[in-house]
């Protein structure tokens, strides 16, 4: 990373999830120009709820797809919505870090809270659901073309 001037975020929930979690603390490693910063974040510190692990358990692929559609359409609140907000924010922070490494000078919690607000606005405005439908349409077209 140091020789390429690259930046990265790596994170893990203390519950063992390979993502930021809403069940307790998550650890984030932020790599910028070869320097590694380590941060612990808790969902309450970021403005989302803390939940029991059973509240974020998935199911069958069809069930999970339905839940994803409901979350992105703004039809579901609670643990699943909050974990989606948290991880969407992490993706946005990672993008910001990759395109502007100087953003690492601001506290990670502040950046996450700001991006949670962006993710929340995307869901609440319908933009997230609209983007999902666009992705589904393109995916179906590509699949149909590959079978032709």
Language model segments and positions:
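Glycine-rich anion-binding loops and their surrounding alpha/beta cores
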Residues: 1-148
């Amino acid at each position: 990373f140091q020789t390429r001037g690259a930046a990265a975020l790596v994170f893990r929930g203390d519950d063992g999830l390979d993502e930021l979690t809403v069940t307790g603390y998550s650890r984030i490693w932020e790599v910028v120009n070869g320097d590694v910063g380590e941060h612990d974040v808790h969902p309450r510190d970021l403005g989302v709820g803390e939940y029991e692990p059973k509240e974020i358990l998935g199911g069958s692929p069809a069930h999970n797809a339905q839940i994803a559609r409901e979350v992105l359409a703004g039809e579901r609140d609670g643990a699943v919505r909050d974990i989606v907000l948290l991880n969407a924010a992490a993706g946005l922070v990672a993008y910001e870090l990759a395109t502007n490494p100087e953003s690492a000078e601001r506290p990670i919690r502040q950046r996450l809270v700001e991006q949670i607000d962006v993710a929340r606005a995307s869901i609440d405005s319908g933009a997230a659901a609209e983007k999902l439908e666009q992705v589904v349409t393109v995916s179906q077209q590509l699949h149909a073309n590959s079978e032709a």
